């Protein structure tokens, strides 16, 4: 919507979480995974351009899970410093080690990044995601005016996912929104205070591989959300976790994930080239 002045947009900073490598031994993968862009910042350049094109936001904090015992991570750190100076972003370094559990180090990076956010709202964005379409900020404003605390942008279509224990239903706020009982780290806009409260759920949990619950901060957060869903009334649960999906029921994905897990590298390269051609 051209010319629309969004209250939420005017009070939102971007928080980007990044790493050069990570320990995934809890998933049965022996060698550390390396972020496809590291030690360069080429992909981050594309992420920033995408954020500017699709949502008009580049006021960013970049929180770096820095493995101090990893050569690639040390080179990436210097490149990140140069990138942040050039793109006017604030860099937060969260030191860790390849010997440490990834859920622990990622959670620390999330928390340190959130503490650097000074705006009322935050757009959380991991370093390997792109928006596929522009965001209608009037819908975003409507969501938060209606009491939503966290508005997710889906990597999949807006339907229930029984295998993930996610229930998606139309929202009473707008037919351009859906209710969901599910938290994940796919890009979302949230009230910063609500986001900090969720991250504190992860901070208090013992790091382990969570199976259905997710491998990073999603794991302990979703375990607590699910426990409350079992034990609270629907009204109490929605008051505690006012989470929504952007778009109507059945809407197509808003997000593309260029992840680093085995088998995704070819898809990442193909999708990135395709996106670059779109301009």
What are these regions (language model features)?
Residues 12-40, 54:
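A conserved hydrophobic helix/loop-capping motif in glycosyltransferases and polysaccharide synthases
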Residues 14-24, 64-66, 93-96, 126-128, ...:
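Short loop/turn segments at strand-loop or loop-helix junctions that form parts
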Residues 30-31, 65-117:
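Active-site-proximal specificity loops/subdomain of glycosyltransferases
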Residues 36, 46-58:
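Short, acidic, metal-binding catalytic loop of nucleotide-sugar glycosyltransferases
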Residues 72-86, 164-170, 220-227:
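Short, aromatic/basic amphipathic alpha-helical patches
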Residues 120-130:
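Short beta-strand-to-loop acidic/aromatic patch adjacent to the donor-nucleotide binding site
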Residues 133-158:
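Conserved donor-nucleotide/metal-binding helix-loop-beta segment in metal-dependent transferases, i.e.
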Residues 150, 176-271:
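Catalytic core and acceptor-binding pocket of nucleotide-sugar-dependent glycosyltransferases
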């Amino acid at each position: 919507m051209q010319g629309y002045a969004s209250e939420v947009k005017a009070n939102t900073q971007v928080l980007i979480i990044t790493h050069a490598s990570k320990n995934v031994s809890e998933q049965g993968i022996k060698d550390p995974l390396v972020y496809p862009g590291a030690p360069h910042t080429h992909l981050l350049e594309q992420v920033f351009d995408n954020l500017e094109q699709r949502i008009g936001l580049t006021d960013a904090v970049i929180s770096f899970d820095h493995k101090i015992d990893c050569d690639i991570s040390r080179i990436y750190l210097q490149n990140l410093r140069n990138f942040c100076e050039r793109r006017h972003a604030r860099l937060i370094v969260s030191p860790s080690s390849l010997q440490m559990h990834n859920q622990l180090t990622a959670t620390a990076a999330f928390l340190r990044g959130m503490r650097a956010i000074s705006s009322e709202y935050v757009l959380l964005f991991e370093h390997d995601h792109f928006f596929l379409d522009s965001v209608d900020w009037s819908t975003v404003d409507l969501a938060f005016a209606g009491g939503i605390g966290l508005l997710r942008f889906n990597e999949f279509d807006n339907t229930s996912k029984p295998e993930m224990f996610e229930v998606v239903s139309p929202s009473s706020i707008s037919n351009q929104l859906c209710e969901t009982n599910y938290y994940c780290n796919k890009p979302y806009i949230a009230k910063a205070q609500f986001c900090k409260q969720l991250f504190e759920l992860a901070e208090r949990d013992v790091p382990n591989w969570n199976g259905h619950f997710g491998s990073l901060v999603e794991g302990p957060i979703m375990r607590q959300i699910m426990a409350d869903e079992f034990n609270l009334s629907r009204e109490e649960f929605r008051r505690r976790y006012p989470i929504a999906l952007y778009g109507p029921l059945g809407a197509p994905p808003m997000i593309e994930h260029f992840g680093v897990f085995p088998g995704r590298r070819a898809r990442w390269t193909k999708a990135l080239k395709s996106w670059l051609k779109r301009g």
